[in-house]
Amino acid sequence: MKQEATRQRILDAALALFSARGYDSVSVGEIAKAVGIKAPSLYNHFPSKRAIFDAIVEATAAQYEADTDKIDIHVQNVTQDIPAFTEITADALFEKVRQIFLYSLHDENISRFRRMMTIEQFCSPELAALYSRRYVERVLDYHAGIFRALIAAGEIQAEDPDTLAMLYVAPVLTLIGVCDRQPERETECLARLEAHVRLFFRLVHEEPPAETQA
């Protein structure tokens, strides 16, 4: 039990340091010092700094999936979520987006991980690809799957689902970025988020105007 607690303290300390300064700028000795152990003792828990990083990636992904399960968001299984979006109201949709937005900003591990990856995407092609998969591609694929199902059910306009996903997701990611850089603007960003969600909802549910004859 004590060994597991020390392992978690190492992960927490490393994530805090990586998110503030970047992976390459932090040494194993600094992580050990933050935990309150000697550097050689750290190697009893992890064979290398990269092993610590990989464990952070794995643990954060597991935490995110477990936490978002509670609000019916399963990014790894879009089919599971389609019923939750069927006949959803604008109010219910905004509440779902608001919850995930605030969770992304205020959960310490999730927020720190995103900040770490924001730094590291410019330092390593491998981590740049991981950033794109984690924060762009899988989110777009998830929402495109939702829109594809809603189009097939005749619930929203039959537009390209991949383009709809970009139109829907991009402002949300932009507002999270604003709050990461300027936390004092959170109230403003929440208001903008609500305006975006409600406008998008209205646009995809409205019938397109009939074409006029020349």
Labelled PLM ranges:
Residues 1-5, 75-77, 208-214:
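N-terminal intrinsically disordered/low-complexity leader segments
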Residues 9, 17-59:
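Helix-turn-helix
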Residues 58-64, 71-72:
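Short, basic, alpha-helical segments at the C-terminal edge of helix-turn-helix-like DNA-binding modules
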Residues 69-108, 165-168:
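Hydrophobic alpha-helical connector segments
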Residues 83-84, 98-106, 114-122, 200-204:
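Helix-loop "lid/cap" segments that line or gate small-molecule binding pockets
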Residues 105-118, 125-152:
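Amphipathic alpha-helical packing segments from all-alpha helical-bundle domains
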Residues 129, 133, 137, 147-199, ...:
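Hydrophobic/aromatic-rich alpha-helical bundle segments in the mid-to-C-terminal region
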